[in-house]
């Protein structure tokens, strides 16, 4: 088992409880979805909602988008994510 209180995590008891509860509540499909990232330029809320609800993406990567578009897309992705989405630029 991973020691979540040790380096590099340094989580407290409340954070560890959140991790354990979240993982326990996830379906196998949701866990597999966390392995996948999307390089997306779409900014449609309907499209992004569908990505999160159908594929349970673990992250999103950006490539040359205007800052306001990135912020808007992040807001939408996080809104529909069960687990916070990892964002990379």
Show which residues each predicted segment covers.
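N-terminal beta-rich core of secreted/periplasmic extracellular enzymes
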Residues: 1-89
